[in-house]
Amino acid sequence: MGPLIFSRSLIFFLVIVGLLLPVRGDTDMLGPLTREAVLKNCPDWQEVVALYQPDGPAIDGLQAFNRPVQVEVFLGTWCPDSKAHVSEFFKVLDLADNALISATYIGIPRDKAQRSEYYQGKDIQKLPTFLVFVEGQEKGRIIEVPLKSMEQDLLDILLR
């Protein structure tokens, strides 16, 4: 009788987990991505974008920045830190509305053994990682969690 109960419990657990995982939106979107594709495939990220309230003075500083900036964002669509902070980054770019600041997004797999091909030879240890380039030179990184806020950390890097 004991093994039968264990088997039923295990089957019940596996069925429940199997039903819940798709609801959580833990999809692996890999390689080059667009913001639009991320938000379409991970709709719960849209709520973070909508609710995030960036700091006004930092946004003003980003709006006024007058040199070309490229941000490479390495993210996992399955990763809670990516959901939180890449979504914040989306909102920051929206509000900064600076044509000189652009971003590219690279989706990284959950399986660490498969990640190196996506890192393009860059030293990426945690997700998300934002590599900030000004006029083609790397000026700094935001790794996993901003120190102050997404907008302030980005502005601090740009003003170095």
Predicted regions mapped to residue ranges:
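Non-catalytic, surface beta->alpha helical segment in thiol-disulfide oxidoreductase systems
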Residues: 126, 132-160
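Conserved redox-active cysteine motifs that mediate thiol-disulfide chemistry
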Residues: 77-85
